[in-house]
């Protein structure tokens, strides 16, 4: 639980500056129409889980360290013989962040993790889904400072989905640019 009176830096920035900026840019009639970030979903698929059932739980522990919240182990919905996957087998982990934890994670992602990614040239501006949500992938989970590089036995990638209340991709792009997301030109 957060301390009384504490407010994440990005949330404060949104309420004081970004909301007013977007209100003027897109000419909304009401302040409640201004898009905001609704949630962030972090998914870590562990493809090698078919051979070792402990790997999804290790991935869930790493994800919990990164997100600051307990991760849920995801299970296969149906069997796929080609991948040697049975229905109900653990195949990954995911976390859904909302409110203060979401803002704290986005702050660490934009200011600490993304600059540590090797050969990073910016986020693709085409990764929006048409409804104002943004998806991105990270190839190595060790770019986050919470992960101790010496204790990691295997490096996994992760998907990060930023869900917004924006109606269009342009609104969502403007919102995320205001949060200093480093988009490619």
From Swiss-Prot:
GO function term, MF aspect, one: structural constituent of ribosome
InterPro entries, alphabetized: Ribosomal_uL5, Ribosomal_uL5_bac-type, Ribosomal_uL5_C, Ribosomal_uL5_CS, Ribosomal_uL5_dom_sf, Ribosomal_uL5_N
GO annotation, biological process: translation
Highest rank taxon of the organism: Bacteria
PROSITE patterns the record matches: RIBOSOMAL_L5 (PS00358)
One Pfam family recorded for the sequence: Ribosomal_L5
Membrane spanning stretches: none
Keyword Isomerase assigned: no
Keywords, alphabetical: Ribonucleoprotein, Ribosomal protein, RNA-binding, rRNA-binding, tRNA-binding
Keyword Transcription attributed: no
GO CC annotations, alphabetized: ribonucleoprotein complex; ribosome
Family, per entry: Belongs to the universal ribosomal protein uL5 family.
Quaternary structure, from the entry: Part of the 50S ribosomal subunit; part of the 5S rRNA/L5/L18/L25 subcomplex. Contacts the 5S rRNA and the P site tRNA. Forms a bridge to the 30S subunit in the 70S ribosome.
Job of this protein: This is one of the proteins that bind and probably mediate the attachment of the 5S RNA into the large ribosomal subunit, where it forms part of the central protuberance. In the 70S ribosome it contacts protein S13 of the 30S subunit (bridge B1b), connecting the 2 subunits; this bridge is implicated in subunit movement. Contacts the P site tRNA; the 5S rRNA and some of its associated proteins might help stabilize positioning of ribosome-bound tRNAs.
Name of the protein: Large ribosomal subunit protein uL5
Source taxonomy: Bacteria, Pseudomonadati, Pseudomonadota, Alphaproteobacteria, Hyphomicrobiales
Gene behind the chain: rplE
């Amino acid at each position: 639980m957060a301390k009384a009176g504490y407010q994440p830096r990005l949330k404060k920035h949104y309420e004081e500056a970004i909301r007013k900026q977007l209100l003027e840019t897109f000419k909304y009639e009401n302040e409640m129409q201004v898009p905001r970030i609704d949630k962030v979903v972090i998914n870590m698929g562990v493809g090698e889980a078919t051979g070792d059932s402990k790997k999804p739980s290790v991935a869930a522990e790493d994800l919990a360290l990164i997100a600051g919240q307990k991760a849920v182990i995801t299970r296969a919905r149906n069997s796929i013989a080609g991948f040697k996957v049975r229905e109900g087998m653990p195949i990954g982990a995911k976390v859904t962040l909302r409110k203060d934890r979401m803002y704290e994670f986005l702050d660490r992602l934009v200011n600490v993790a993304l600059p540590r990614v090797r050969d990073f040239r910016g986020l693709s501006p085409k990764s929006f889904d048409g409804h104002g949500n943004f998806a991105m992938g990270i190839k190595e989970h060790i770019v986050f400072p919470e992960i101790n590089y010496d204790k990691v036995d295997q490096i996994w990638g992760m998907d990060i989905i930023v869900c917004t209340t924006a109606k269009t991709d342009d609104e969502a792009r403007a919102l995320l640019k205001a949060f200093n997301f480093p988009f490619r030109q």
